[in-house]
């Protein structure tokens, strides 16, 4: 079975920046996010030897969720300038390395990942998603796994049930009930994880709660119907995206090795230069390009 590896690029970059101490070239250009991102990427390539790999980024344009709810993710701090300047460099390196990258204006990386996972799992691919984002757990199925790159935790259907008490397809219902402070998703006041699990055992889904709202509100007098409807719209991933991709589009291409090494030299990343030679020589010998 063919395997498609999907990396949540925005999350990788963000976490690399804050996980590592400040690093910069002798000219003062910041490099910690670049270094951390490439370390994780090269480690994945060495371990998994992927043939199909895509890195997905959030697009800079306003998203559909922000249009629905102006306060969505509003309390998240804006990316600092030393992080912002590193993102175009990471994208340039990916292109030089022959690794497909994808972003779609109006949609978050999560939505593009959801689209890819659904489309290519239906085509018979095994899909492995590398991201710490719990929203993506709604995609887990027999042929779709989510791996947290921070601790290598692998989420199968059984693992999702054990950790959250609900099946993967119920994760949006669960998150709509409990809310998400990080993303500013309101949820239902007074409903925590245990209560949400019990609610879903009784009602089955957010859709069914809304159909039986009077009964539900007698149990939870502080609940607001509009909050639940909004929360579900915010946590449910979009998969009906207007893009067409083939298997070939997601295949790792032959790298421009000279320019790639030149770029790493500019960034003064000597340790990664050695890895690049080793990784792409092995890939060439396996005739992946």
Curated annotation (Swiss-Prot):
It comes from the Bacteria. It is an enzyme of class 3 (hydrolase). GO terms for molecular function: 5'-3' exonuclease activity; 5'-flap endonuclease activity; DNA binding. Disulfide bonds: none annotated. Keywords: DNA-binding, Exonuclease, Hydrolase, Nuclease. Residues 166-256 form the 5'-3' exonuclease domain. GO terms for biological process: DNA replication, Okazaki fragment processing. Its EC number is 3.1.11.-. 5'-3' exonuclease acting preferentially on double-stranded DNA. PANTHER family: 5'-3' EXONUCLEASE FAMILY PROTEIN (PTHR42646:SF2), FLAP ENDONUCLEASE XNI (PTHR42646). This is 5'-3' exonuclease. It comes from Aquifex aeolicus (strain VF5).
């Amino acid at each position: 079975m063919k395997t498609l590896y999907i990396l949540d690029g925005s999350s990788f970059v963000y976490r690399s920046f804050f996980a590592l101490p400040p690093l910069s070239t002798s000219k003062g250009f910041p490099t910690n996010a670049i270094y951390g991102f490439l370390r994780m990427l090269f480690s994945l390539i060495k371990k998994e030897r992927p043939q199909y790999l895509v890195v997905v980024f959030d697009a800079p344009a306003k998203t559909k969720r922000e249009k629905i709810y102006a306060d969505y993710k509003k309390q998240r701090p804006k990316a600092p300038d030393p992080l912002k300047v590193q993102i175009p460099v990471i994208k340039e390196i990916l292109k030089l390395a022959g690794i497909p990258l994808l972003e779609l204006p109006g949609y978050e990386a999560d939505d593009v990942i959801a689209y890819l996972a659904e489309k290519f799992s239906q085509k018979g691919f095994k899909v492995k998603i590398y991201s710490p984002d719990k929203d993506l757990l709604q995609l887990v199925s027999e042929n779709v796994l989510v791996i947290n790159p921070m601790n290598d935790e692998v989420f199968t259907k059984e693992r999702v049930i054990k950790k959250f008490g609900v099946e993967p397809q119920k994760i949006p219902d669960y998150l709509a009930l409990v809310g998400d402070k990080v993303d500013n998703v309101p949820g239902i006041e007074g409903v925590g994880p245990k209560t949400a699990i019990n609610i879903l055992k009784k009602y089955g889904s957010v859709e069914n709660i809304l159909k039986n709202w009077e009964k539900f509100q007698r149990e939870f007098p502080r609940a607001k119907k509009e909050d639940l409807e909004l929360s579900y719209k915010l946590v449910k991933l979009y998969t009906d995206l207007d893009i067409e991709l083939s298997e070939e589009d997601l295949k790792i291409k032959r790298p421009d090795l000279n320019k790639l090494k030149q770029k790493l030299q500019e960034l003064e990343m000597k340790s990664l230069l050695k890895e690049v030679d080793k990784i792409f020589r092995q890939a060439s010998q396996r005739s992946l390009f």
